[in-house]
Amino acid sequence: IKAAKKYESKGKNEKAKKRYERALKLLIKSNKEKPNKADTLNYLGFTTRKLGNYEEGEKYYLLGLKIEPNHKGINEYLGELYVVTNRIELAKQRLNVLKNCNCEEYKELKDIIDGNKKSKY
């Protein structure tokens, strides 16, 4: 995923896409071997979302939240997905979960919801 993000930041989107596709295969394998890990589901959600499959990404995020409802990464990224898919009220619900964490994820999502920042993901 890191390599894909790096390519993306340099505008090399085709290379980034290939890295995300490779990461997705590895994450699916990892999830089969060790299921029900919130972090793995977060990465699966992120990777599928980056590949443009928002519906699948949302499913992974929601599975992760069933395991760990206060997972900062999942709540932030799911909130971003909701903003991108024009479901602001759902994004605000994710923000509400993060409000007491005093964390970067809260600030990032708030800025995106408020329109002060564009999601980089």
Residue ranges of model-derived segments:
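Register position in tetratricopeptide repeats
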Residues: 9, 50, 84-85, 112-119
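Start-of-helix register in tetratricopeptide repeats
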Residues: 39, 73, 105-108
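Terminal, low-structured helical/coil segments at or just beyond the last alpha-helical repeat
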Residues: 90-121
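Structural marker of alpha-solenoid helical repeat scaffolds
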Residues: 33, 67, 98-101
